[in-house]
Amino acid sequence: MAEPLRILGVDPGSGKTGFGVIEHDQGRSRHIASGHLKLDRKRPLPERLLEIAETLQALIKEHQPDCGVVEEVFFAHSPRTAIVLGHVRGVVLLQFAVFGIPIHEYSPTQIKQAIVGVGRAEKSQVQHMVRILLNHQGALQEDEADALAVAITHAHMVPNYRIRG
C-alpha cells in the first residue's frame, strides 16, 4: 500500500532560515507546516548555528520527514557572506545526516523551473505558485515560501509515493 512522502525543505540563511514540510501523494502536495527562524545577527555565529541546529532537530523529531531538501548556493554578496552561508548549510546538512535522512539539493533555476515553469522567474512568481500548488490561503514569508518551493521541487522530481513494507 502506498503512503505519502513527507519532505522537509530548508532555505538556509544567516539572518533567516526558512523551513517547509509537505506531504506528497498521488501527484498532489499538501502543506503540513512552515515558517522561518529569525536570527539575531548581533549574536556570535556559533550561537546562531546552534539555534539553527536545535530548531532543525525539533522539526525533524516532530514531523519525521522521509527526506530533506536544500537549495544549492549560487550567489553571495561577498566572500564573508558565502562563508557564513556555507556554515549554515553545513549545520543543516549535518542535522539531516545525524538523523539518517536522505538529502537532496536543487539549484535556484531548477526550483523556479519546477514551480513556475520558467528558470528565470521572479521571487514573487515563485511565492504565488507555491500558494496555488499547496492551496495555501495565508501569507508566506519569502524564506518560508522558498523552503516550500524546494520541497515541492523534490516532490516533482521523485516518484510520488513509497511502498509500505
Regions found by a protein language model. Name each.
Residues 1-165:
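Phosphate- and other anionic-substrate recognition elements at nucleic-acid/protein interfaces
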